[in-house]
């Protein structure tokens, strides 16, 4: 079957946009072809810094013929209805319609519309200009003389050429020469900008990819990544070092080069006095280079690895030299930041009021930065006040939470006061992603308690489902205070996540609270802390996500979770106990019996029957009734006591004793007895079953 090759070649596409853009191109083109009546066997997208490419194989040569019958009005309908039918069906005269007889409804018109299939070339030429014009780039530009004209083409960078060929795998292909803003699709592409800028004629994907590789362009981004990673590891190993791998940087660098050449540079060892995180970010952010370390050690070396797009005749010496100069200049700046952050600020006399407010020691550099943060009235959020006000709120909340977590109150207070101080450091100003980490380092340098220093870094954690949860009690307390303050604040100003939009990462903050409470075994009544039922519901949503990710069944979570449940740890423990019980033989049988009882009660309640609150033993006629009543009385008491003692497994064990009596009751007893009093008493007995199991879960919500 025929294949379609498409290439959109432009000036350099930002690396961060390439993967998604290639995926968008694949989806837009294949969706349009399918909508036009074509089918295909497979499609794969490719990208380099200068091109998006698409290979669609097994594409049908033309769309199928379509025959459609469109029912019209009755033959005796008024003229207006008939005219509307003709317009809608595309008929010029009613004589072109067929008459169909319906014995019940009478004769009516039917238009038979036949649409012949279309050649794939025609369809592609029709859909591609619109796809290119409306392409969903996050940012795009106009260029050239035509850029000022209305409707001028916009692209991420100036679009230079288009390749579009179609044909069978082993035969000659044809060019589909659609045109857009003066660019006509052809079978001509170009290789590497510097090594092979000459025109290359291509036919289909196989020779296209091979021709590009001969022209120093590796089309497959995953291959470029593999080459970079393999060569970087090798060059590091050859120098007695190991590569510090970075998947994000690898993805970015592979989007900067079409012909990757891996080289090694160096800088003076004096710069290794800078924290390794700063060195790594400086080299990564500014030069897109990898750092290395001694084999088997955490300490960085003074060698870095860069990836060039040019196979230089001098083996890359000039490229390494140029990159080294820039790296050294950047590290010199970083060293300057690092040293300045450890020194005194020049305007200490203006910080006295802020220092007094937070109990700060202006002889210490980090304290000075916190005082400066407050004195400058740095805004946290327009509706939530300054960073200083935020720290004051976190500080007050942390003191309350310390009583729950068992954290040392004095250490918690000190950590809360210094938690945001590094926001005024030059290192964090240059690299915002180092907030918390730099605070920890500066805190250690000025002699803070280890728990305080750790809490300054860890109060931002966890920052996602795979991030670690704080372990130190002070860090746990501060992490909870920070996240709860953020959530209650944004809820108070009605800035809540909507759909896929969550600009303030509130879902992540709520999941962080859930993980801390559950993974560190903390009992915290959230309503007493947040005083917001809607926010509690938001926590419930995050709890459900977390528990499902841990393997819990959604129906068991729903069976346990009530709208007012604000102790999330207890909810999780109930779900755990219920899971173990409901998968046991006793649990399965009790569930079946309870569901039967619940269904009978629901049917009666739907009819308006009022179920009695109490049961009269005097009305028991059968031993099965007496046995069930006694079992419920005992199990209910034991289960309630176990729940009160938060021993949910024992509560389930107590309920398991109901299995036999419930089974025998339904085997031996007819609930709908002819005697109305006995019938009502038996319904009341069923109600006791529902109430007994309800002490631990709503069994009606459990599937099975």
From Swiss-Prot:
Pfam families: DALR_1, tRNA_synt_2f
Source domain of life: Bacteria
PROSITE patterns: AA_TRNA_LIGASE_II_GLYAB
Reaction(s) this enzyme catalyzes, per UniProt: tRNA(Gly) + glycine + ATP = glycyl-tRNA(Gly) + AMP + diphosphate
Enzyme Commission number, as recorded: 6.1.1.14
GO biological process: arginyl-tRNA aminoacylation; glycyl-tRNA aminoacylation
GO molecular function: arginine-tRNA ligase activity; ATP binding; glycine-tRNA ligase activity
Keywords for this protein: Aminoacyl-tRNA synthetase, ATP-binding, Cytoplasm, Ligase, Nucleotide-binding, Protein biosynthesis
UniProt-annotated location(s): Cytoplasm
Record has Cytoplasm as a keyword: yes
GO CC term, one of those recorded: cytosol
Quaternary data: Tetramer of two alpha and two beta subunits.
Record-linked PANTHER family: GLYCINE--TRNA LIGASE, CHLOROPLASTIC_MITOCHONDRIAL 2, GLYCYL-TRNA SYNTHETASE
UniProt record similarity statement: Belongs to the class-II aminoacyl-tRNA synthetase family.
UniProt-recorded name of the protein: Glycine--tRNA ligase beta subunit
Species the sequence originates in: Rhizobium etli (strain ATCC 51251 / DSM 11541 / JCM 21823 / NBRC 15573 / CFN 42)
GN (gene name): glyS
């Amino acid at each position: 079957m025929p294949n379609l090759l498409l290439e959109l070649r432009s000036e350099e596409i930002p690396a961060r946009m390439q993967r998604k853009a290639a995926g968008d191109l694949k989806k837009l083109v294949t969706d349009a072809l399918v909508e036009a009546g074509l089918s295909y066997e497979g499609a794969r997208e490719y990208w380099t810094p200068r091109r998006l490419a698409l290979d669609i194989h097994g594409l049908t040569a033309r769309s199928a013929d379509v025959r459609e019958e469109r029912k019209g009005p009755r033959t005796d309908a008024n003229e207006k209805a008939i005219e509307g039918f003709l317009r809608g069906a595309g008929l010029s005269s009613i004589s072109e319609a067929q008459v169909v007889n319906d014995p019940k409804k009478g004769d009516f018109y039917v238009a038979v519309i036949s649409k012949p299939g279309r050649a794939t070339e025609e369809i592609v030429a029709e859909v591609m200009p619109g796809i290119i014009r409306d392409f969903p780039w996050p940012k795009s530009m106009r260029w050239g003389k035509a850029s000022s004209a209305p409707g001028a083409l916009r692209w991420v960078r100036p679009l230079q050429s288009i390749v579009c060929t179609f044909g069978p795998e082993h035969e000659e292909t044809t060019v589909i020469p659609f045109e857009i803003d003066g660019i006509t699709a052809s079978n001509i592409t170009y290789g590497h900008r510097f090594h092979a800028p000459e025109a290359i004629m291509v036919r289909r994907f196989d020779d296209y990819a091979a021709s590009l590789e001969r022209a120093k362009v590796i089309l497959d981004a995953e291959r470029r990544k593999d080459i970079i990673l393999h060569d970087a590891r090798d060059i590091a190993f050859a120098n007695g070092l190991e590569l510090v791998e970075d998947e994000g940087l690898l993805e970015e660098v592979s989007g900067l080069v079409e012909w990757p050449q891996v080289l090694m540079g160096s800088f003076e060892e004096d710069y290794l006095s800078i924290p390794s995180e700063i060195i790594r970010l400086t080299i990564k952010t500014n030069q897109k280079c990898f750092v290395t370390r001694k084999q088997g050690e955490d300490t960085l070396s003074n060698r870095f690895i860069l990836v060039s797009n040019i196979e230089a005749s001098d083996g890359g010496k000039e490229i390494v030299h140029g990159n080294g100069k820039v790296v050294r200049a950047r590290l010199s700046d970083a060293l300057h930041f690092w040293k300045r952050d450890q020194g005194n600020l020049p305007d200490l006399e203006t910080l006295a009021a802020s220092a007094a407010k937070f109990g700060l020691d202006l002889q210490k550099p980090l304290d000075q930065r916190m005082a400066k943060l407050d004195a400058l009235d740095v805004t946290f959020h327009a509706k939530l006040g300054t960073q200083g006000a935020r720290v004051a709120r976190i500080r007050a909340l942390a003191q309350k939470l310390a009583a729950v977590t068992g954290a040392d109150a004095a250490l918690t207070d000190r950590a809360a006061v210094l938690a945001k101080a590094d926001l005024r450091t030059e290192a964090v100003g240059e690299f915002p992603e180092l907030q918390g980490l730099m605070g920890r380092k500066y805190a250690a340098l000025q002699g803070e308690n280890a728990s305080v220093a750790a809490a300054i870094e860890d109060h931002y954690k966890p920052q996602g489902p795979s991030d670690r949860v704080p372990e130190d009690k002070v860090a746990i307390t501060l992490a909870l205070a920070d996240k709860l303050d953020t959530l209650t604040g944004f809820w108070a100003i009605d800035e809540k996540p909507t759909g896929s939009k969550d600009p303030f990462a509130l879902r992540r903050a709520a999941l962080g609270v859930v993980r801390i409470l559950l993974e560190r075994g903390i009992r915290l009544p959230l309503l007493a802390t947040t005083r917001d039922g809607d926010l509690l519901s938001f926590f419930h949503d995050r709890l459900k996500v977390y528990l499902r990710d841990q393997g819990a069944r959604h129906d068991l979570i729903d069976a346990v979770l009530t709208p007012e449940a604000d102790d999330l740890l207890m909810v999780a423990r109930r779900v755990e106990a219920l899971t173990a019980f409901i998968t046991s033989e006793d649990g399965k049988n009790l569930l079946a019996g309870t569901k039967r009882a619940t269904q009978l009660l629901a049917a009666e309640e739907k009819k308006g029957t009022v179920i009695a609150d109490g049961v009269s033993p005097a009305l028991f006629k059968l031993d099965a009734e007496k046995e069930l009543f006694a079992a419920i009385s005992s199990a209910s008491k034991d289960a309630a006591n176990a729940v009160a003692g938060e021993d949910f497994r024992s509560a389930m064990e107590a309920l398991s004793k109901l299995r036999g009596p419930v089974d025998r009751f339904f085997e031996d007893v007819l609930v709908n007895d002819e005697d109305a009093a006995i019938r009502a008493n038996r319904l009341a007995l069923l109600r006791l079953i529902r109430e007994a199991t309800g002490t631990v879960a709503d069994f009606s919500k459990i599937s099975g």
